[in-house]
């Protein structure tokens, strides 16, 4: 077959295959047009699930008479005019494809009147030919679009439509999503002449919470934590549900970029990562999130239905979202919103800047992002329970090197291993003479045999065997790293701002030299009782820095050793599940030891006595 240029009619029907998937797609495109036209009231009338009639009526600016026919032409739009406009899109629509695509698979009537005209005009088009008829009509300022007999000329598409109930459920979900994003707009949705949804315009907090409750349910609002998180041009706001309000299906997840509803993999991953410590893979978080950023930093022209976007700085956006949600989830003082309340619980001081409020929060392990997170924990007593996380059940299985046969551990060794795990203090090897102790410090005569239940290394030195706790080994490595001269530092991508209460300020004056000594770099603003964290020790880069600092500043630590011990107790340790990683940890720790510190490693060894076991053989 020879190559030919497709006719406009065929091209429009092909485009309709991308834009018009089902009646809900038509509703989405037309309601977004109404929003772009500045409408404050939008009515959506549906008959028979949208297959018979879809009518969208708004009070927007309207379309002039001489532009009505042009509005149905393909690639005709008032929203962009140049390539520069394409890089700076804030409108919901911009391609000029929707009306042309819809009219090519339906009988479409467009009636409109701008405020500058005394009378309204109506244009009608149907099917493949798309010939338009213009005539006067009676209509208030605004626009009405009627789409009748959807897919009447494409039977193959029409037979794929589901039942009226199913198709209307999809339309209802589209309106719910749009209504969450556009709180100031009133929406009325009818089906077969009956009002199904009616969302009044919401301007203050009480009204907005009522709309969220109407769409997401009262239980969501009662378990929701508010987020208001800013950094430069990035702004994250909305509500996230507490982990206890998890879902078995992904039915309460609403995310918007500059007011546009999206389903983006980067955002989804960031949200899942923020909830990783709280939810299992079978559980889903519930959230309503609004992300606002410079339109130049996001490309919305990457998907036929505009459901996906592409960020120019994906890592920054990912970390910013993850950090903001983590802060809310980890904050003991996060506010629970009640359906009959319009304000958050006043358990803490709120930092106000311009017209935004910043919520107190703690972060999960630093994802290379933090924002203007300003808080005051004057009413909080440090508690270890605050920082506990749900550990996932893992299958504990010993890992052995390839050249070492697997052997069964006797009850004697199991008892010694249990003692190692139950003892939170550093274990000391007592029945050793100085010569043997010094000999054991030599790395060359130590052999790492196996990883035992992902918690300890089984070591051999000549005829002696030892268990070495991986948790204690990790703490020792971090402690040694913080005592290096100089300490390796890394700058924070987004500085963390702390607002201190008087008690914390006192402890800060006491401990700030200790912070500097181990590689932290703060900027002080004592007049406003603020400190800003700018640089951190490299070994703590992935730690929950806010949690660590709050714990340190909540108690008197008058000596450096006490300060360092407290910090090492707070840090979150990595779960090591691979034998090679455990050996690497041991090697890196040994490299940090100097001659005076060599005994520190030996003190962690628990000797295993095989003699009683061997005598029974």
From Swiss-Prot:
GO CC list: mismatch repair complex
Taxonomy, superkingdom: Bacteria
Pfam families associated with the record: DNA_mis_repair, HATPase_c_3, MutL_C
GO biological process per UniProt: mismatch repair
PROSITE patterns, per database record: DNA_MISMATCH_REPAIR_1
Function: This protein is involved in the repair of mismatches in DNA. It is required for dam-dependent methyl-directed DNA mismatch repair. May act as a 'molecular matchmaker', a protein that promotes the formation of a stable complex between two or more DNA-binding proteins in an ATP-dependent manner without itself being part of a final effector complex.
PANTHER family: DNA MISMATCH REPAIR PROTEIN MLH, PMS, MUTL, DNA MISMATCH REPAIR PROTEIN MLH1
Protein known as: DNA mismatch repair protein MutL
Organism from which the protein derives: Pasteurella multocida (strain Pm70)
Protein's gene: mutL
